[in-house]
């Protein structure tokens, strides 16, 4: 019960973590650009859902999350829905189709942005990239890199103009992903060298 209350509190209190940081960029400048139109912004946040989507926790289903977001929108509120990772793995719901159904549910719920957690890599590198491509929302990571190419695998930041402000979400994948997942997934097919890394 303690865990359920904690997650519910995070949802309603619009918390953010270091994995997905919400920053108001240049608030005075934004106010000048949108005089008289600066409003409160609600950020709904989930993480470590681990495919627990059954009715044992009805207030935490994706249908409930979608309804919560819609309730803010229907009230004329500015709202964004974000996830900080570890959502496609954890129960049989995820393993049956390697997270495809979870991504579909997140699409239907109206997520705006997400960052990959260490468990997004549990089905292998190819599936991790494929699952993220199935999302209608962008995934962000400033420190997941392709070593041979010397660039990021995903965008590092997403900007939203909302509530009279410019809001930036910066994605950071936990560096422990490299060891908490399967290191071989970050190597080439011959497992002779690493081609991906999560920089710390």
List the predicted regions and their residue ranges.
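Acidic, metal/ion-coordinating pockets
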Residues: 2-15, 19, 31-200
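C-terminal segment of classical bacterial N-terminal signal peptides
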Residues: 24-29
């Amino acid at each position: 019960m303690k865990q359920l209350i904690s997650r519910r509190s995070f949802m309603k209190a619009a918390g953010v973590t270091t994995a997905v940081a919400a920053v108001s960029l240049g608030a005075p400048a934004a106010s000048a650009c949108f005089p008289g139109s600066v409003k409160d912004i609600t950020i709904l946040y989930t993480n470590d859902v681990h495919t627990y989507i059954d009715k044992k926790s009805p207030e935490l289903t994706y249908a409930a999350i979608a309804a919560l977001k819609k309730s803010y929108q229907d009230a004329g509120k500015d709202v964004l829905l974000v996830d900080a990772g570890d959502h496609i793995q954890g129960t049989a719901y995820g393993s049956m189709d390697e997270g495809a159904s979870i991504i579909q549910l997140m699409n239907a719920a109206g997520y705006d942005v997400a960052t990959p957690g260490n468990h997004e890599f549990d089905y292998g590198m190819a599936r991790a990239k494929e699952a993220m491509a199935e999302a209608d929302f962008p995934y962000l990571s400033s420190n997941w890199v392709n070593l041979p190419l010397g660039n990021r695998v995903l965008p590092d930041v997403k900007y939203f103009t909302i509530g009279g402000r410019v809001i930036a979400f910066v994605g950071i994948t936990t560096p422990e992903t490299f060891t908490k997942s399967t290191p071989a997934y970050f190597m080439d097919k011959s497992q002779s060298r690493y081609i991906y890394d999560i920089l710390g």
